[in-house]
Amino acid sequence: MPMIDIDWLKDHVEVPEGLTYEQLAKDLVKVGLEEEEIHSSQVTGPIVVGYVVDATPEPQKNGKTINWCHVDCGDEWNETDEDGNKVPRGIICGAPNMKAGEKVVVTLPGAVLPGDFKIEPRKTYGHISNGMCASERELGLGDNHNGIILLRQYGFSEAEYEALKPGQDAMHLPHLDQPLLEINITPDRGYTLSYRGVAREYHHSTGAAYTDPAVALNEKAPEPADYQPGTPVDIDVEIDDNNPIHGVPGCDRYYARIVKDFNPNAHTPNWMRRRLIRAGMRSISLAVDVTNYVMLDLGQPMHAYDLDKLEGPIVVRRANEGEKLTTLDGKEHDLSVEDLLITDSPNGERGSRILGLAGVMGGLYGEVTADTKNILLEAAHFDQVTIARSARRHKIPSEASRRFERGVDTALQPAATQMAAELMAKYGNGEPSEHPNDVNNTPRAKAIHFKASEVARVAGLDVDINRISDILTDIGCTVAGGGNGEFAVTAPSWRPDLNEPCDLVEEIARLVGYDQIPITVPPAPVEGLVGLTPDQQRRRRVADELAEFGMVESLSYPFVGDDDYKAFGFDPEATKKVSVEIANPLYGDRPYLRREILPTLATTVQRNIRRGIENVSLYELGHVYLWDPNAPAIPALPGGVRPTDEQLAALDAGLPEQPDHVAGILTGLAEDDGWMGGKRPVDWSDAVEAVRRIAGRIGAAIELDQPAADDVPVQWHPGRAARVMVGDVFTGWVGELHPRVNEALGFPAHSAAFELNLTALFATLTGKPVQAKPISTFPPVKQDLAFTVDETVTAGQLENVIRKAAGANLESIELFDVFTGEQVGEGKKSLAYAVVFRSPSKTLSAEDSDAIRKAIVAEAAEIGAQLRA
């Protein structure tokens, strides 16, 4: 995010004396530019101005020559000799540019430099060095370590230089004592990625006088050559975009201007280098630094080419299949046909040599070097989507791409090039051409029909019509009309985000002040459906019950792919045919919407287990997507008009069914070791208990039906899974996951799970409150019943028989023993139940309980069950 320097900001807007960075942050946040951080200096003093009294070269055995210097640091900081007199400090310095008579920056013992480098007296090269003459790199001001800072070369006037006295605090000279404000820029406010834009916003916040630098620069910029009949252009430029994204040309303006006879040995002025470094950019060379400085100041990314290496025409085109580019950072990139390129035409082969990835980064060929004397300046306007995609595709988030993808001013190119040309002329003795080439195909801005009443309707603000006009004019809009409260508003060239009336309402609300929007509480409806629907209430009850059971809710992305299908034993090809495929998936390996929650929930469980958490108990509520391959195709609806009821019905008919599901997975230990007993692993009974609790909470009368092994889905254990039924309605599965699934996912053995179709389950409910069974005051009759049954008969089947036969007098039933062995015979098992009978109206006699018992035995015989003696 941009770093804001108050001294630089002063170039464009009046700033009150003594403005602090804290106050600047408060002023900018009023207009939507949030403070990210105020960065303090990494350098602490004492750091002072020193005058080099003498510098004696001393050659060393290693071939290096050091200077033994005496530096006057002022009476406060000078050393004291044996007689008590103040004398210059003795300092060792190895810099080649150290010489007597210079004023330098001296870091004294006690100072701390970047990297926690502490300055203290130390013996070196046979002397005690009592301080250090600092270079830019040592102070964190840049990469220049070829010599120490000579204040004579630091941009001071002659009078200012003479006024620098030994011992004077030097922290402020290279701005080491000044913090920086880092602000957060939203994607729609790309113009504030420049001092020009931030100064404008400071003006909006405080009313301070603001001068747009682009106005004067545009006035000074020469007319393009095509506006001057008979005048040759600097270089021919062609825009040839044969693959525009969404029909939008990748480049609609390309402005080229030449600077000749540039001095390649010219140095970047210290004031500019300081500003670039404080903005977080590296000083490279005057030509490159100028283009970066213009970008930071005005907001127009620029590129400088070595003109002598180029052959016209310059062609802006899309990449061809198989083309490659080596960028300035030395990395080779395989280009996409969506990438926009800057190319030239060697040997008359039009657009055959790639110079750079437009709006992102230049290539190695054509870059400015230490021998460059003639420069081609490029300032263009590129499509936001094109640049954003290229930057992300090649992982090059450059400063230029950050600005282009947020939108750059379409009218700024001449001004930016003029500013760069002036700086190159002033500091590099270059000669700017007066015949730039401007290929300008930018569309004419459309007027927005805006009603003043929209401000009150949308934002609730009562703003006078004249103030509305003033605000829109102040942000740069051209405003016409207004007599009847309606305006024709044309957005300024630097605001591509202003396209609709609601955008203008947002701007007015922003500048009036969000704190001025009245607080109104929307009235609650007093008729019709109020509050949560019955199904919403039931969903909450399900979530509450599972949480009370000790499970933790999880939310996962509803995307699945081949790996998920295979882990659960599904046939990927068959499953894809009935799955909804996403046109632009978030993850390339998960392009389908889930048909069940378990595969996506399993990913979360798997992630926990991989991090060493084996005892996992998670559940998730959400949609699944059941696509019918025979469903009608979803129609393409026309834009700009409201669809008809028939069109909406056709759209709805083509959508997949999206029922609500709840799923849970339990792994590891259900009960850990403790003083009350040993550990117990999770098994199918824990999942069954979770399902029973859900049913009990919402009042559903579920039954568990264990099918034949061949009828169990592949993800479930064939002998330890059951259907969850409500009468004849299938609502889900519960049991243990198949051992193959546990192995594929890395789950512990016997991991259990459940998945219920809540939409189907809720549909079985009457909507009437669950009635609590009346409490009987009569005594209970307790009996234990043990039956011998075939191994194929489930405990649930026998329990249902007992419930049916006992009728209303059955209070409770619990399976307490399952036994197999020689005593019951081969292919048989014994199921023992503890049952309690109690009448709501009388005390059950021995005859009553005996009659109930006989009824149970008779009913059980229908499924082959025999009462054991």
Model-derived features with residue positions:
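Phosphate-backbone binding interfaces of nucleic-acid-interacting proteins
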Residues: 1-229, 351, 376, 393-395, ...
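A carboxyl-terminal module marker
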Residues: 3, 23, 473-480, 619, ...
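Glycine/proline-enriched, intrinsically flexible loops and inter-domain linkers
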Residues: 3-6, 12, 24-26, 41, ...
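Beta-rich nucleic-acid/ligand-interaction surfaces
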Residues: 43-46, 219-221, 294-296, 490, ...
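Conserved mixed alpha/beta core segments that line enzyme active sites in large multi-domain catalysts
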Residues: 49-91, 273-274, 278, 291-368
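Class II aminoacyl-tRNA synthetase-like tRNA-binding/catalytic domains
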Residues: 122, 315-368, 524-658, 720, ...
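Mobile "lid/hinge" segments at catalytic clefts and subdomain interfaces of large enzymes
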Residues: 128-150, 157-160, 174-175, 179, ...
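Extended, well-folded interaction surfaces typified by the phenylalanyl-tRNA synthetase beta subunit core
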Residues: 197, 448-616, 836-838, 843-844, ...
